[in-house]
Amino acid sequence: MATTELHIEDPYNAMIPGSNICIGGKQDQPLSNLRFVVKDLFDVADMPTVAGSPDWPSTRPVPDEHAAIVTQLLDAGAKLIGKTITDEISLGILGENKFDGTPENPACPGRVPGGSSAGSAAAVAGDYCDFALASDTGGSVRVPASFCGIYGIRPTHGRLNLDGLMPQAPSSDTAGWFARSAETLSRVGRVLYQEDIPDRLNHRLLIARDAFAYSGSETQTALAPGLNRLSKLFREVTEVDMALNGLDQWSEAQRTVQAAEFWQTFSDWIDRHNPRMSYSVARNLFIAS
């Protein structure tokens, strides 16, 4: 696949400086007419993975191959046009980055875009590309999608190949993606899931009452038509309570495990290299330790 330089206007500060490339995908494939960007946690061959940190790339070799999911998208015909800004080592939920700058929110100028997949969300909302690759450990696809008014999906953990993605908390890490339309979101999903999805599913749909109860009335009203359409695709629909002891306990457990795992992920790097960090990231790592 040929790699060439490509100039992209970046009014929303979504892109990593110097990452304006064009890697052409295969022809006559399901995604051949689509352009995409990737969050700068995914390896792209011959480009440093910066991960939102001034010292991460200098302590890691430049990758000589693409992340597995990037290769999958290129093989499906999509054209890669650059890498996007992330919260520092992906530890953030607002999209702020002291070193690379904070991407603008195209949907709401003057507000943060959400993180940590901030640049990927801004690039899609700002019409740089058709879709963007991102990651989600504790909300890093879902929050930016909400803030920027676009579609985003966090697949089931373990569903997609994460080889070539910088880990944060492995028991929660997933890849995900953004798009401006449901049709594009679906096209990408059919490629990444590597299976045909029938028009009607011979399975049961479980609707988590306790989870929906956490949403405000406006959110529940907005979701109702989509939930009704989704219900018609399944053989059986059942309402359940996911957490018998309450979702607050699940949330607290997830935060505790995630903090312990990201300390395991980064502690050796910190001890060896004493990297520069923003106050908020240093504080979070100190608490996790």
Where are these predicted regions, by residue range?
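Short, basic, glycine/proline-bearing loop/turn elements
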Residues: 51-57, 102-108, 287-289
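Amidase signature
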Residues: 1-26, 30-31, 194-289
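Short, flexible, mixed-charge acidic loops at enzyme active sites
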Residues: 47-49, 90-99, 278-282
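Short glycine/serine-rich loop segments
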Residues: 74-189
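Conserved active-site and cofactor/substrate-binding residues in soluble primary-metabolism enzymes
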Residues: 64-68, 118, 145-148, 180-190, ...
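Acidic-leg catalytic submotif of subtilisin-like serine proteases
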Residues: 32-41, 72-76, 81-83
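Flexible, glycine/proline-enriched loop segments at strand-loop-helix junctions
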Residues: 57-59, 107-108, 172-179, 208-218
